Structures are given as structure tokens and as C-alpha cells.
């Protein structure tokens, strides 16, 4: 972080080693310096309860396909006061309230002012159903079950002599490991 830093963008849970980052503390630190925080929730939102109010992040993004939903749909959460200050780069159908001439364009209220054209209606409906399904199970239960499965798998993998587990103690269900004499990307 330098005096020129305007945005900190980071994953809440890394997809490589599975560490859960202290987002609340990072946001507090950043906000003291006037820095915005953008959180990648792709590996956290589908697997644990995430409360944007508690975290105090400025933006959080995640995708439907990692939550049992369709591809091509996602969410960008943003604090309302920040979203209201965003102006679209391009304009499209459904964004403008009135269009008197090219120099006088009045945009609709959020979220419509930032969403041009016909949305992926089927995808959004499918994503909504996926979210309902996961919420009916309960994100705490999902996280608890994933952690039990992780512990079980680590218990089995640790007994295999040619496997080296990199992140035995991580707080997510992501397990990173190496197989002796095999390039990691080939294993993946």
C-alpha cells in the first residue's frame, strides 16, 4: 500500500491454498486510508456465510456457477452510495429515464442505470433458485459438512507417502497438495 493506492482487490478465500483472509480487518485498515476494497467472493460465498455489512467491504463479486447455478450470471454487490456515484461507460436499453438529446441523458435509479439491454432472465431465475436451495440447507451447515469432508480426506491423503499436503491447517475446505515427481498442473 502506497499513498497512490486507490483500491485493494483480493479474494476472501484463495483458490490455491484455501486461506481465509481477514477481510473485516483489511477493510478497516483500507478505509482509514481512504482506499476502497473489492472482494472476490467466488470461493467464499458458495461455501460459508458472508455478511457484507459485517465485513464493511465496498464491493463483493461472485458467480452463479460456483453456487450450483447457471453459467453467465453473477453478482456485484456494492455499497449504495458508491454505486450511485458510478456512471456507465456505455449506454443501452433500459438504463435511461429520458433521452432528450445526446448531451442530456437522465439515467434511471439503481440498479437499472448500470444494466444495459435485456438481462439473462433465465439465468437470473436459475441463480435465484440455487441461492434459495443453498439457504434452505444453511450456509453454516454447508461449511461444517465441507470441513468434515476436508478433514476426512486429509486423514486419508496424509497416509499416502508420495503426497505432500501444503495447507493442512487452512480454514476452508480447499486442499492443496503435491504429488512427488509430477508437475502440479498435470495433477490438476
Describe the role of every protein-language-model region.
Residues 1-188:
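Pyridoxal 5′-phosphate
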Amino acid at each position: 500500500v502506497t499513498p497512490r493506492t486507490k483500491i485493494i482487490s483480493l479474494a476472501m478465500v484463495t483458490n490455491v491454498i484455501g486461506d481465509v483472509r481477514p477481510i473485516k480487518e483489511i477493510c478497516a485498515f483500507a478505509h482509514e486510508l481512504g482506499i476502497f476494497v473489492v472482494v472476490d467472493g467466488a470461493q467464499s460465498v458458495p461455501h460459508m456465510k458472508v455478511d457484507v455489512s459485517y465485513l464493511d467491504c465496498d464491493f463483493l463479486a461472485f458467480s452463479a456457477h460456483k453456487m450450483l447455478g447457471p453459467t453467465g450470471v453473477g453478482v456485484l454487490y456494492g455499497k449504495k452510495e458508491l454505486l450511485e456515484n458510478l456512471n456507465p461507460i456505455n449506454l443501452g436499453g433500459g438504463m435511461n429515464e429520458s433521452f432528450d438529446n445526446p448531451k442530456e441523458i437522465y439515467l434511471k435509479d439503481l440498479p437499472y442505470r448500470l444494466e444495459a439491454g435485456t438481462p439473462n432472465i433465465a439465468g437470473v431465475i436459475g441463480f435465484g433458485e440455487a441461492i434459495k436451495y443453498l439457504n434452505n440447507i444453511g450456509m453454516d451447515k454447508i461449511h461444517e459438512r465441507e470441513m468434515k469432508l476436508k478433514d476426512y480426506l486429509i486423514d486419508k491423503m496424509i497416509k499416502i507417502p508420495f503426497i505432500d499436503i501444503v495447507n493442512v491447517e487452512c480454514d476452508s475446505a480447499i486442499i492443496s497438495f503435491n504429488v512427488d515427481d509430477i508437475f502440479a498442473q498435470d495433477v490438476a
